Structures are given as structure tokens and as C-alpha cells.
């Protein structure tokens, strides 16, 4: 999976997919009532990027729906995964459940269209704090209550903070999650390349072990050829990037093109491939 990073304005959807992304990451900002209101990152962000691009969350979801609905004029067949980076830093722990309910309602209305010819992409809810595990509960309970429990098949989860993996496992247990787990790790592209992969390798070991809880591992932010090769060498399933074309070129190189291919809609993002 080549995950286009910080796609928060509508024109960036086409831009990143045309450069080679089959997955997109959006930053979702909440107001004080735990309502998701904007796709927006803000400063600081990755080097050489405009941190201030934004859109109203419902509008952005509607555009994502068009981009992932077969038959729509804006449809991109290869766009198969959407990762919502939920910026929950401003909400407290006892609002997390409400935040999850609100995200579910917005997705249900504006992306899934209440199950009536909605967007078909898989969705990952990425949460920065394990303390906010109730967000997952609120999300799942809302889909159930609204009669769309079947859509949970389309949803996966990621705790994106740098927590110990045991702590992450515990949070999933509390959230009632078993499976559909992506684990991320990374470092901003502004910092010189340090070997930041020990935690990635630990996550890959967990994924590859019979009693692991992780299904997929991705690394961010991968913008250079050397970093791409390092991440692939560590065994990741996906990379998040500001430059999808760089990753595409590496995957087309000999030595890589016989080992890797871009994920399509037929590839289940919750299925584990062990090294």
C-alpha cells in the first residue's frame, strides 16, 4: 500500500492517486464537542509541504465517496484504502466514545451513503492515544445501532502513538477489537535518516508470530529511495509518503518488481502475510 500523506484538500485526492497512491491519509480535526469538523493538519508538518490545506469534513467525505464509487465520473479504481488520522489531542478521555459515535455518523452519511451505493474503499481509524480506545467502542456501537454492522468488515484500526506494543494490545482488548489491526511507526521527513526501524522490526516480528495481534505494518514518512528500500527490507506492508512516484519507481526496479506489487481492491487489508 502506497499511502499518500496529508491529503486534506479536495484537489489532492486526484493529485496523489495520479502519482501512484492506492491509499490516502487524511488528518481529521475535532472541535471541543468531539465533533470531526475539518480535514486539516496545521503547523508544524513535514518539510516542503503546505501544512494549511483544509476542507470541511463532510465535504471531503463526499469527494472521497465519488473517488471510490464505481461508475462515478471521479472514480479511481486503484484507490482502495483510506486512513483517517484522528487528531484527538484536544478531546479528553471521557469524550472519546462521543468522538467515535460522531465519526461513525459522518462516515455513514457522507461516505457510505447509509449502505446505498456508498464508497467501497477500506477504512482505517488511526488514533494517537491508547487512552482513547473508547473511540473505537463508540464507533462500532453506532454502526450497530444504525443497522449497518456489516460495514465493520470494512474498518480497521491503528494506534499511532509510540506506545509499547503490550500497551497497544491491552487497549485493543479493552476496545473489544480482535483483528483488522494496522501498526504504524515513523519519523518526520524533516529529520535526517536515522535507523528508526527497531520499532518497525518489532511490529513485524509481532505480525509474523503465531500469537501476534498485528495484521499489517506501515512506516512513515518515506520520501527517498534509500528509506523506501530500508522499509521494504524491514518487511512492511505499506509506506506513507509525500512522493508516491518515488515508491512506484522503487517497486518497478529489478529485485523489487518480482517481490512486490501494488495492493488492489481484491487484497484484503486485514489479512496477514508473514515473512
Swiss-Prot record:
**Quick one: which residues bind Mg(2+)?**
25, 27, 85
Return the broad EC class.
lyase
> Which cofactor names does the annotation list?
Mg(2+)
Q: Which residues carry a glycan?
A: 252
Cofactor binding annotation: Binds 1 Mg(2+) ion per subunit.
- Report the active site residues: 5, 41
* UniProt KW keywords: Cytolysis, Dermonecrotic toxin, Disulfide bond, Glycoprotein, Hemolysis, Lipid degradation, Lipid metabolism, Lyase, Magnesium, Metal-binding, Secreted, Toxin
Where's it found, cell-wise?
Secreted
Reaction equations catalysed: an N-(acyl)-sphingosylphosphocholine = an N-(acyl)-sphingosyl-1,3-cyclic phosphate + choline; an N-(acyl)-sphingosylphosphoethanolamine = an N-(acyl)-sphingosyl-1,3-cyclic phosphate + ethanolamine; a 1-acyl-sn-glycero-3-phosphocholine = a 1-acyl-sn-glycero-2,3-cyclic phosphate + choline; a 1-acyl-sn-glycero-3-phosphoethanolamine = a 1-acyl-sn-glycero-2,3-cyclic phosphate + ethanolamine
The protein's name is Dermonecrotic toxin LarSicTox-alphaIII1
| Higher taxonomy | Eukaryota, Metazoa, Ecdysozoa, Arthropoda, Chelicerata
